[in-house]
Amino acid sequence: MHSQNDELEYQLDTLAIRTGHTRSFEGEHAEPIFLTSSFVYENAAEAAAKFSGEVAGNIYSRFTNPTVAMFEKRLAAMDGAERAVATSSGMGAILSVCMAFLKAGDHVICSRAVFGSIVALFEKYIAKFGVDVTFVDLNDLDAWKNAMRPETKILFIESPSNPLAEIADIPLLADIAHAQNAMLVVDNSFCTPVLQQPLKLGADLVVYSATKYLDGQGRALGGAVTGNHKLLEEVFGVVRTLGPSMSPFNAWVFLKGLETLRLRMKAHCENAQQLAEWLNQHDKVEKVYYAGLPEHIGHERAAKQQNGFGGIVSFVVKSLSLIHISEPTRPY
């Protein structure tokens, strides 16, 4: 058996296929799906020891499940993290982070360039618990510095952002956060661990919507948080108690997705680059947002921080309405 530190010495492709697979007594080659709500014990003493936490072991699948644990170990290894906690969705991951580290009177600084549901989470729901939120432009470092308060606990960003592919200076934002003992939380859903590892750039926690690229085929909802053991133990406590847990079947789907993640991300990057360059020359396109284009404001930063520019391209047309573009479009 290899420890997780040993596994970090392997290449990403090996980690994506082998990490976390704990075979049962059947000796199966592929990861099994443990579709069970709870677990049985040899005797009452064993049950008491596991329920009390004296002995590690599975109790209830809302807490831990072998298939989910395999996914968590694999994702953590790929992300260069000490630990991962899986959740029922990407928003479940972000909510779990908020519930773990925020209380009444605390303050969050969030990039304006984030997924719409994140804005709703902070403005409509987290605010109900007495947490104040300030939204700032992702690349205005002075705005981030000026927004800091003694009660600031979390800086939250997406990089690349959704949908305009703004690229954050993750190391500098980490420095701003850490100067006042706050945490930098990075949504890495668009890059995945294949293209970017924010923890190595100074982030404290990384969140994922596994629904997107980690699955890659639109089959299941899920999310995850990665980071160090101490922080992830707090997140795990929230997930265990409040219940935004990942299902064993979805975890198995994501395990299969991770196996092909590097190959898929390579193809996504190549296709997006070709599309962005074609759109950039089109006479009816006003502007293209893709960090792979040299004129993109975040191009140099993305080239430095990432191992590819990603698969999301956004663009603005000059005169046609959205309906004139979307109606003739057909899926392949």
Task: Give residue spans per PLM region.
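N-terminal "arm"/small-domain region of PLP-dependent enzymes with the aminotransferase-like
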Residues: 2-65, 73
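Conserved PLP-enzyme active-site core in the AAT-like
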Residues: 3-8, 16-25, 83-284, 289, ...
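Conserved glycine-rich beta-strand-loop-beta hairpin in the small C-terminal domain of fold type I
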Residues: 30, 273, 289-314
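Conserved N-terminal alpha-helix of the aminotransferase class I/II PLP-enzyme fold
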Residues: 43-92, 117-124
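Short, solvent-exposed beta-strand edge segments and adjacent coil->beta transition regions
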Residues: 55, 220, 308-312
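Adenylate-forming
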Residues: 75, 93, 108, 324-325
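Short hydrophobic/aromatic beta-strand micro-patches
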Residues: 226, 314-316
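Single conserved hydrophobic/aromatic residue that forms the stacking wall/gate
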Residues: 323-324, 328-332
